[in-house]
Design a protein with these regions (language model features):
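Extended amphipathic coiled-coil helices
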Residues: 1-168
């Protein structure tokens, strides 16, 4: 005899679209989330702003953290499993990539501006180092903005674990 614990989740219908995600990112994605780094900051942002309605109702929930099983309710009222948050990632990826790229560019420009305040004797060395730093930042950004392709491996595991830690 095997006992199954059934968790009851009351969710509002999942009506998130790429257009809605884009608007939410445009209005609420701040440097604070970006600077938390990678999947941790993104998961916190998603938990704070994406998976809840304007009135605070959940539209998406972590059902089984150990197996990375999330659930949402479709338009017909049926609960759908979203293993490793694949459906959610497909929806938010374009907006997440766009806004993380914009944040990266913003911080790059600020870094270059601050760098220009140094004297000319040291500026060549600083610019060379900055260019290396920028290449590294762009490589990091490229890896993060292409996480949709990588998420089948470690990135999605990391995101879904972080999301599971943030969604109650």
């Amino acid at each position: 005899h095997q006992t199954k614990n059934k968790q009851i989740i009351n969710l509002a219908p999942f009506d998130l679209t790429q257009d809605k995600a884009k608007i939410i990112f445009a209005n609420k994605y701040t440097p604070e989330y970006f600077l938390q780094g990678g999947m941790k900051g993104l998961a916190r942002f998603v938990s704070d702003h994406i998976v809840k309605t304007d009135t605070g109702e959940s539209i998406y929930a972590c059902y089984d953290r150990s197996r990375d099983v999330f659930k949402y309710k479709n338009e017909a009222g049926e609960y759908i499993n979203d293993i490793k948050a694949v459906r959610l990632v497909e929806i938010i990826h374009p907006a997440a990539a766009e806004h993380s790229r914009a944040m990266n560019d913003k911080f790059h420009e600020e870094y270059m501006s601050a760098l220009s305040e140094y004297d000319e004797e040291n500026i060549t060395n600083k610019i060379t180092q900055n260019e290396l730093d920028c290449k590294e930042m762009k490589a990091t950004q490229s890896r993060e903005s292409n996480f949709l392709h990588k998420y089948l491996n470690t990135e999605l595991d990391s995101f879904s674990k972080e999301l599971g830690n943030n969604i109650k």
